Amino acid sequence: MRLLILTLSLITLAGCTVTRQAHVSEVDAATGIVRLVYDQAFLQHAHTDRYVSRGIADRACQQEGYTHAVPFGQPVGNCSLFAGSLCLNTEFTLSYQCHHSAFPVFL
């Protein structure tokens, strides 16, 4: 019986995980900072592909004259939609630092 409950719980929780594609929200050419964002709805566990996000940040840096982007910090979540005291949508921000280099660093 425990195995059945555990299996059903895992199947239910796995259905709540979604992959989101981050998009550019801010590019500061002076400081070389690129910020990408993606949303996570209530009762979801959203994540983004780090390789794809890095490519998006690289392209944004290249448009500003840099060669590549390096991720820094942790994703920062901010509630973007409230219903009373309940957060219905969280916006996650990923930060990247643009660099000039002949040899890009792959992390």
Curated annotation (Swiss-Prot):
Question: Taxonomically, which superkingdom?
Answer: Bacteria
The family database entries (Pfam families) matched by this protein are listed as: YecR
Protein name from the UniProt record: Uncharacterized protein YecR
